[in-house]
């Protein structure tokens, strides 16, 4: 095998890397978001049509009217993607459906196009825009419909078996054995009934028929004995039907008819029971005779029914070779038998099954019937009697040692529900609700004038779609911290959600890594915490097939020549189980044959050394095992998996920096992940760049047309980071389709660039890097190396209140002119203003609550005219820690035609941008799970420096490496230093990257010392440190956990309503909880006064804290504390239990507790006239202090008539 190590590879148009890969790429990575886009496209092309054809035609109860589906069409969307974002609207297109209403009595046909609501569209990036925010529909991992068998051991240690037929929707059918070897069935988790009762109910009533179908077995005999004929007046079938009905509907009068209808509806009605395509495929596959007969001994001679030729003799062992001969005959229905159920059974159609007799492996003398389901068509979506009989046969055969049990955690038994299918299921719910309405309207309205439009009520359909996008567990606000987070979110697989698991019920087995995950689901990338193993990520090469099973690609090995071909087969997990797969790093000769006689290979869960003539397939690439984020970790093979998990997860939390750098030591995944993430601006057609500036790129296509591309500038992302694109093409450059025209956030030259390449030394310094803390040079602050831009959005809306409309204005009560200096004439902050915490952004006043006016007040108001009502200041101010520069202001009003929610007259959005430099307390990390908090930022001159005088940037604690076992960071450090010296970028792909030799070879080439260490000098004294230190370049990222977001202090603030104690948490401007253990600490020190003030003034002594506040303001001594509110709550609780409890002081005089009624001052009535007079005088006195009003009575009498008119 030729070594490719050290060759140069081009990534995109602008970046070359020296790659250490030894294995050539046979297959390019697929489009990484196709799991989203392909699934949605399927839904638009086929899924919607399938839905309409399932539900329609709808017939009325008499069968006179029929509403049929003709066609559907999605019209042009109302808004573009950018407009939908700006207007807080949905990016959606109106769905129009053509329906035909046929009146069978008159033969009249009416066709009409009906509007079916706006249907959300997927953007090119694989997201949806709902209410202006980008959302992602996460794919769900669920158990596939099908028939499953499992072993179980009872409390006495006796082995038994169980079986479950799981539909896509409908009733479950379970079978189990008990300690007495009797077989039972349960329908939909109800009480169990003997297995033969269900067989009789299906129409095979007599014992003889049952033994004829299933053959003789001990379990079956025990079950038949248990199932006695109790009522001689009923036939066995009718009795079976009644027994089933009794279990399903206990307490209701049982008749054979009602039971027949019930069973028909439960299993054989396509509207109520649906196996789906995948269920039918799985059932046929499991009950297929070809796999079940393998390695058994025939108990009958098999004859070709057409020619009478003997195919296989009795007593033959059915090996692979024999089965190859037999397979075509089995497929053509060999040994099919037709059984006719009795007239009173559930299904009266004849049942065809295939029965082949074999000898039992447990008792070689005894014959056993193996029953196949006769291969129903793929179109049969319900379960059929033949399926039930064949699955019972499989279940009974298990006791004879024939067949095998299933592993429910195997990816052959778990499938993906992607966007398209999830939407389809939701749409079905809406259509089913609509169907009920249509039926009712058909019977009520006049058939002569009826049109499809009058029948249809689209509300349930619209509501179900809205509910799905708005509040489903799988519709998530997109993680947009950086492009890698975006990409990973779209490729996420969740086992939670409707129809899935719940966190509490999910055991260890479901969460564990399974051998079938290889190449399908990443064994590393999953969250830490309660969701571990329930939320996974799709592996880099994996695809989802039409049944929803994950497939992974393998290179086919030509068995005859022993050559590994370039032909790629995508295999699902259950098909892969039949093959032996060699690893991607197996050495090959020039002609593609294996270089060694024995290779490492996988056969199901085993890793074996096998001879090359047994190998069927070979892995495509070493990185097909892992997900995209994991594949971005260089030297992954040298890291412990727990740390690699943290490394993969933390890359998603990297904050986009002002001028990011792609890593010098990469893995070669940087370009592809950035290209497919949706954050880069990609060229749609070949052409030449005709114009380029910061906000627009124009490309002249080869056919002469002009394409315009808008470059996004400083848009707020979902997570409050700056989403900014910058062009990387130049004027006159020739560009091809799919080339990156502009970098998105966290990208450089088309590659993912989450952090910076910094000079790192592994050394301790004065204890400042204790417990993984990071010491940093001030250069990184000064040169804006780790500076990021954050944009926060604040909004204020003017609503209609009961007391009148709120008003956005500059005139705000009790606010000085200084505070209004940056507001415009409307009272809205100007763009570019620098604001601090507490500054005004939008001036707004709300009418003050005036209590209901009495008759006299209304009269006086009418006489003297409406005076200016009192208003409250409800302006929007900058919250704590939110200061910055006003980046943009958006104003939405009804007059301008903007859609606002009811009761809102005006909406103002203010965007404030912050430039955050790196800070002590910020969290940083490498790519190997090596995270820490910046503990000290030191002057550049105090940092240790290299012999050439270069000060290092960061000091990490060497003790963070050995116990964590992430040695990859040390290798990255050395290779990074060599790359820096040589001025090159390198790629070291996962599991196929630079070996130890490669690293040391590159170190030598760069002219570094043989151990890659160096002498460091103390920046303060200039003396060299004792030992040589590992210094090199490491890629470090700044994470979204920034100290500015967490810093919080409270003086006084809001209190809880009931307990009157301070609230908690930064969002509520709350306090720090002083809990039980903290109280013990103060008690232990005997700090009585400190303890007293913490439990009273600082907590819930309502009166005391107000008096204390006043005392501090006036500079008086602090008064004695009162009774805490929580004590009053306790007293009231005891009083409510009927205990007369009072509080006495030392002198045994009762202490009055604050009563709730004291607060309700509003309830005290005031004489209406005096109240009105007080309101009036304040204004009157200012204007007419000199004038005296004489003879008010005369005025009142004169104005009486006017008053009456006004009141009317």
From Swiss-Prot:
Any one annotated GO CC term: DNA-directed RNA polymerase complex
Keyword match Transcription: yes
Matching SUPFAM superfamilies: beta and beta-prime subunits of DNA dependent RNA-polymerase
Entry annotated with the keyword Transcription: yes
Entry's Gene Ontology BP terms: DNA-templated transcription
E.C. number(s) listed in UniProt: 2.7.7.6
MF GO annotations: DNA binding; DNA-directed RNA polymerase activity; ribonucleoside binding
Region of interest (Disordered), ranges: 1182-1208
Keyword set, alphabetical order: DNA-directed RNA polymerase, Nucleotidyltransferase, Transcription, Transferase
Family recorded in the similarity comment: Belongs to the RNA polymerase beta chain family.
Function, as annotated: DNA-dependent RNA polymerase catalyzes the transcription of DNA into RNA using the four ribonucleoside triphosphates as substrates.
Quaternary structure note: The RNAP catalytic core consists of 2 alpha, 1 beta, 1 beta' and 1 omega subunit. When a sigma factor is associated with the core the holoenzyme is formed, which can initiate transcription.
The protein's name in its UniProt record: DNA-directed RNA polymerase subunit beta
Gene name in the database record: rpoB
